Amino acid sequence: MLYPQAVPPLALQVQEFVPLAPYTTFRIGGPARFFAEVTTEAELLESVDFARQRHLKIFTLGGGSNLLVSDSGFDGLVIHIAIKTPTQIIPSGNFVDSTVAAGTDWNAFVLEVCEQGISGVECLAGIPGSVGGTPVQNVGAYGQEVASTITLVRTLDLESNAFIALSHDECGFAYRRSIFNTTHRNRYIVTQVNFRFDRTAKPNLTYADLQRHFAGQATVPTPLDVYHAVRAIRHGKGMLIVEGEADCRSAGSFFKNPVVEESVLAGIAATLQIPAEKIPHWPAGEGRIKLPAAWLLERAGFPKGFRMGEAG
């Protein structure tokens, strides 16, 4: 649908027919009918008001990962969250509190934390996207989840049109989920995330790939060591976004590792005719286990490098 009215002059710049491909990690996708890049909370309010006055659909865009845009684009207003105030990292006894704007590059924040010798997010290095997207999915990798360090999430509540702060418990964090992608999907727009890190915590080395990486090392790895190790491991799997490398372009891991009853493990082992202990799995509480989706996909006949037509 085309909107013949001209875009009126605003403090916020609203563009028309903006290609979305450059804003996604896949580098594909059609145009946004209207596009606004917001750098302050005031601009965010203004952009929402712009959409409401014209009865436009709203899509909030962060770092552009975990996202596939149709060639037809988006017939509404795309709000690109580019709020990037300086990150605050404040020591408080055995803890460190940090306040981070939603538009901050996630990996850059992880690096900043690790460079100060602080553990808590070192295993989340190399995950594409911005800080504002991390609480939505409760991103996790290599034995860590971002929810373990989040204390507060500041948001714009689209129902009340007011900025509110949601506590850790109010966010309803679970495995790859929160209220932001389930019960309250499309209600809140994240503008800031507060973290708390334990200064006495040791780097997380529970993941098998990390244990193999540091096997035989005499000294205990630092958070920065783990940061670089995780990025190297991700790069080796084609899971690190690297400009100029065609094999390192993706939307991130967009599937969830299934959590199932322990009895399912025996069934899979019988089907594959292998011992159950040969199947990688982790305890998930209350008689349940977590299975790696990538491993299951490969055993189902979709090995690395599988292609179907132009997709693969």
Predicted regions and their residues:
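Anion-binding (especially nucleotide phosphate/pyrophosphate-binding) glycine-rich loop
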Residues: L2-E159
